[in-house]
């Protein structure tokens, strides 16, 4: 499955700019800013979250990489995203070890902003 995935430069993750609105927090992190490793981006697997593929199909193939309660780092997920994306994070459900567990969580592809080029 990984061999068929699109390649994406690692710095594309950093090209997404942060946004805040309403009760949702929208940023370019897979999960919490309270990640135990500074700069690490990850997502906590949970039965109630979904990742939308770039064509908005469901579920995203990256879900196959996620066992429940596992962590997925950016290098695992990056090949599945061909462009910048935004993560919309709901309220934290609970605290586990050094990271927060969020649900629901949706990764929604968005075009790169001209000012970021």
PLM features: what roles do these ranges have?
Residues 40, 48, 56-117:
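Catalytic core of Fe(II)/2-oxoglutarate
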